[in-house]
UniProtKB/Swiss-Prot annotation:
This is Ubiquitin ligase-binding protein BUL2. Residues 1-10, 35-57 have a biased composition (Polar residues). The gene is BUL2. PANTHER family: BYPASS OF STOP CODON PROTEIN 5-RELATED. One of its GO terms (cellular component) is ubiquitin ligase complex. Present with 339 molecules/cell in log phase SD medium. The modification Phosphoserine is found at residue 557. It holds the Pfam family Bul1_C. The keyword Cytoplasm applies. Component of a RSP5 ubiquitin ligase complex which specifies polyubiquitination and intracellular trafficking of the general amino acid permease GAP1 as well as other permeases such as PMA1. The RSP5-BUL1/2 complex is also necessary for the heat-shock element (HSE)-mediated gene expression, nitrogen starvation GLN3-dependent transcription and pressure-induced differential regulation of the 2 tryptophan permeases TAT1 and TAT2. It comes from Saccharomyces cerevisiae (strain ATCC 204508 / S288c). The modification Phosphothreonine is found at residue 22. Pathway: Protein modification; protein ubiquitination. Residues 73-82 have a biased composition (Basic and acidic residues).
Length: 920
């Protein structure tokens, strides 16, 4: 919906929302009033006042009465219009909570001001008014390069009279600026004298180009913000999250600490910055960001890996030279004092006055997807928003290490606003995915002129994203193996190239580009062709990553067999071979005694005859998903009724994007059994099922380097294959170390051979990265250091005998009468009379769970087993949605165990399932 904002009245600082239907009614009433007024004027023109007679005077009285009636009608219509306008105003006020001015921020402004830390060599006062045409022309002529396009000829001149001006600081090229020195020369010269600038000073300042926030080579990028040292200062920052957008001079309602956000939700709040000292404090920059990162800790290596996959900057909340209107559309007047006596906004002077509080409002909208550059391997599933997972116990000197899960509540926190929420999500202490609202003040040390963090504050958020396509149980093992095979082929190709040049080294022969890459993109076989080795290797990696972009289409449409060209369902299969002696008396279980049939007795031909066959079990991977499960306190706080209007509309919009089949939660699995009896076996009834049990398997994998391939449950749960994979890449890792050492020892000789036949070409350096790039090295280290943790949970689902549906006795009797007569029916009747409860349970178990064997054709039977998946309401664990990121992943499986009578064995199958947040 597109909202049209009126530029007229702005009550409480919010623009009114225009309602089309109500406005049309008002215009219609106004049109009717104008028509009546025009008709009244026409009537008056037909009764002129000149030449009135007594009869005319009577008509005049009638006209007066008519006019008064018209006035009353007009007043009545005005009341109706006013009432409609008031209704329109009330409807506008009711929709203010949903109002959002969704405007794309200026990339130039972000690139110039927030992408790096400004160094302040521009006087902020000069940004208040635009320069004159003469100043712009003078500045342009100064900045423009000369005819030879040399930037070095544009020089900086120190401002006369500056105490900090150095003799050798009067000539610096624009490309070699030192912003810290330049800014002091400029700002100090304009303020040290304590007087207004002369005309000569104006001329000198106008010649200084505005390199602040523009010259990327001289500024400190925001990525280095996290490596700056922290300084202890008397500055305090407090972050508050509110339920709705804050309105100046009104106290907002704060959000609950247990609040969970999802994709598309809006996060409102404000920051309080207070200088508690008696002296003013200068700062360089103030940032308010929404950030998310993954933390992986390797205790053996003593290594902590952080991958920041999300950083959103609120331009209106962070410091800037001007006041940016917030996206909420609220009219905020900088410099005013709010209800808590805090000054709204920060001054251009970048100074915090003593014992003064400042306030900055912020608003963030959670994205539905990350940027493509988030994953270098271009895995689409890695570019989806992952859920909050564990907590970072090692952050801020182990500030959150003391958080424990309350056994009653099922979660734990510090008890203060902004604390992370710890649940039993089965994430170890060395792995976490965190979302925070961060506020940082960057300052500068007066003695060393180096930047530092004067104060920082964070507010932890709990995010459970909406389930978009990408992470699904439908992705099969073929995709994983294909990507793994392509990666291994590339690594083997690089090793072969290294072996070639080492052989050339032994033979003292010249090294060509064909030896390095075994290819020539120029289309010729000239070994002296000047090729960029890094470019060739980059293209090979790009080609490898292009295949990663192609996700499995199994979740969208059935896969096809390349030979038969027929659709093949995404199935999980297993089989069991059985063999047992045929006896007159069968040692069956209690249920089989209850439900034995006449075929069992008739098939017993002799005590020494063996019955054998094969049972095949197949389950189709379900498209439905299990619901995200959290502690009851979190579920109660985040129920649909407790959400804001914007969050309700956002959730309904997201749910409307999903197909109907995905919206339905997974409540059962249809297991198909096929019994194929041996030809040399006597005819017999297939083995009966004695029990059906379920388990919930949790698979968590992590690595301290970016994972290059897409994982699947089949690979991660196969211990033998996983160990072979790790062993192979550990061997690759060892080879890389040996090759690197040998290359460095013979670096000079290798470069001599590489440039031997390059007489007419510029000499080039041969590097080890031309063979094994940093990306390939990362891929090897990632799979070599892969760690997988598998947890079996036995109490997630209810037992099958506790999932029976209640049926009427008539229905049960009809179903029971439809069964073929049994030779042991008298025994069953006796048992039913004796153990009525057991008979009822056995009947329901057969009718609702295991059903009966059906003969399809000679020596072949089929059976459908319904495995109910009803969650236990007393689950202590938290089942977070499936996730797959560059450093970690979480998958789930439902393990179904079917046990047969007479100790014939059991069948076990692991069905991959998804856990998604589809219900509130």
């Amino acid at each position: 919906m597109t909202f049209t904002f009126s530029t007229s009245s702005r009550k409480n600082g919010r623009p009114p929302l225009k309602s089309v239907s109500t406005e049309d009614n008002i215009h219609l009433l106004r049109k009717r009033r104008q028509q009546q007024l025009s008709s009244n004027s026409t009537d008056n023109s037909l009764h002129p006042n000149s030449g009135q007679t007594p009869r005319a005077s009577d008509s005049q009285d009638d006209d007066i009465r008519s006019a008064s009636t018209t006035n009353l009608d007009r007043l009545r219509q005005e009341r109706e219009e006013n009432s409609l306008e008031m209704d329109c105003t009330q409807s506008r006020l009711s929709h203010r909570a949903n109002m959002l001015v969704d405007v794309l921020p200026s990339f130039e402004m972000y690139n110039a001001l927030h992408r790096h830390i400004p160094q302040g060599n521009v006087d902020p006062d000069r940004h208040d008014f635009p320069p004159s045409y003469q100043e712009v022309r003078t500045q342009r002529m100064t900045i423009l390069p000369s005819n030879d396009n040399s930037v070095e000829r544009s020089q900086l001149t120190a401002v006369p009279g500056s105490e900090n001006a150095c003799n050798n600081a009067t000539a610096h090229s624009l490309t070699n600026l030192h912003p810290l020195q330049t800014q002091h020369l400029t700002i100090n010269s304009t303020r040290s004298g304590g007087q207004s600038l002369h005309s000569s000073s104006d001329t000198n300042i106008s010649q200084i180009p505005f390199e602040d926030d523009l010259n990327d080579s001289d500024n400190i990028f925001i990525d280095k913000l996290y490596t700056l040292p922290k300084l202890s200062t008397p500055i305090e920052i407090d972050i508050r999250i509110t339920k709705t957008a804050s309105i100046p001079h009104e106290r907002p309602e704060e959000q609950s600490i247990l609040k969970e956000y999802t994709s598309g939700d809006i996060i409102h709040g404000y920051c309080l910055i207070e200088n508690r000292s008696s002296q003013p404090l200068k700062f360089e920059m103030f940032y308010v960001t929404l950030e998310a990162y993954i933390s992986v800790i390797d205790r053996q290596k003593g290594k902590r890996t952080l991958k920041r996959f999300l950083r959103m900057v609120d331009l209106s909340a962070s410091w800037s030279y001007t006041n940016i209107t917030p996206s909420t559309g609220i009219n905020i007047v900088p410099g005013e004092r709010d209800f808590d006596d805090a000054i709204i906004g920060l001054s251009n002077s970048r100074e915090l006055k003593p014992n003064t509080k400042y306030k900055k409002f912020f608003m963030f909208k959670l994205p539905t997807q990350l940027l493509d550059v988030t994953c270098k391997q271009e895995q689409f599933s890695h570019c989806l928003l992952p859920p909050s997972f564990g907590i970072d116990k090692y952050k801020n000197n182990c500030k959150y290490s003391g958080i424990k899960v309350n056994s009653v509540l099922g979660c734990g926190h510090l008890g203060t606003k902004g604390s992370p929420i710890l649940t039993l999500d089965m994430a170890d202490d060395n792995l976490s995915i965190n979302y925070t609202i961060d506020a940082k003040i960057v300052g500068k040390d007066k003695r060393t002129s180096k930047l530092n963090i004067m104060k920082e504050k964070e507010y932890n958020l709990r995010v459970m994203p909406f389930p978009f396509a990408g992470v699904t149980n439908q992705q099969n093992e073929k995709t994983c193996l294909r990507q793994l095979k392509n990666l291994e082929s590339l690594i083997e190709d690089r090793f072969e190239a290294l072996n070639k040049i080492f052989k050339k080294l032994e033979l003292n022969e010249a090294i060509s580009n064909v030896d390095i890459h075994d290819t020539d993109i120029s289309g010729t076989l000239d070994g002296n062709e000047d090729l960029d080795s890094d470019e060739i290797l980059r293209r090979k990696l790009d080609q490898l990553h292009i295949n990663n972009r192609i996700d499995d289409t199994a979740s969208q449409s059935p896969s096809y067999d390349s030979k038969n060209m027929a659709p093949k369902e995404n199935l999980v299969e297993t089989e069991l071979r059985y063999k047992f002696k045929n006896k007159n008396k069968s040692n069956s279980s209690l249920f089989s005694h209850f439900l034995s049939s006449s075929e069992t007795g008739s098939s017993s031909t002799g005590p020494h005859v063996y019955n054998s066959g094969l049972i095949v079990l197949s389950v189709k991977k379900p498209q439905s998903t299990l619901p995200y499960w959290s502690p009851s306190l979190l579920r109660k706080t985040n129920k649909f009724e407790a959400k804001s209007e914007q969050e309700k509309e956002n959730w309904q919009r997201l749910m409307g994007m999903l197909p109907e089949g995905v919206k339905t939660p997974l409540t059962k699995l249809d297991v198909h059994l096929t019994c194929i009896q041996s030809n040399n076996s006597a005819g017999h009834k297939p083995p009966e099922i004695s029990s059906v049990t379920t388990e919930f398997v949790v698979i968590t994998a992590k690595s301290d380097n970016s994972i290059p391939i897409k994982f699947c449950t089949e690979l991660l749960m196969n211990e033998n294959r996983l160990n072979k994979l790790k062993t192979k890449f550990l061997t690759y890792q060892k080879k890389v170390h040996e090759y690197r050492k040998k290359f460095e020892e013979n670096h000079a000789k290798l470069n001599e051979l590489y440039n031997r036949n390059r007489d007419h070409f510029t000499p080039k350096e041969l590097l080890f990265t031309n063979f094994i790039s940093d990306q390939i090295n990362n891929d090897i280290d990632s799979l070599a250091g892969l760690k997988v943790n598998i947890i079996d949970l036995h109490d997630i689902f209810k037992k099958q005998i506790h999932t029976f549906e209640e049926e009427n006795e008539d229905i049960i009797s009809k179903k029971g009468s439809s069964n073929p007569p049994s030779a042991s029916s008298s025994n069953n009747n006796f048992l039913q009379a004796t153990f009525s409860n057991g008979a009822s349970t056995a009947t329901k178990f057969t009718q609702q769970i295991v059903h009966e064997w059906e003969k399809v054709k000679p020596l072949q039977y089929k059976r459908d087993v319904t495995v109910n998946l009803k969650l236990n309401p007393n689950i202590k664990e938290t089942l977070v949605p499936n996730l797959e990121t560059c450093l970690c992943c979480r998958f789930y499986c439902v393990r179904v165990n079917i046990k047969f009578d007479n100790h014939l064995g059991s069948m076990k199958v692991d069905i991959p399932v998804d856990v998604k947040k589809l219900q509130i």
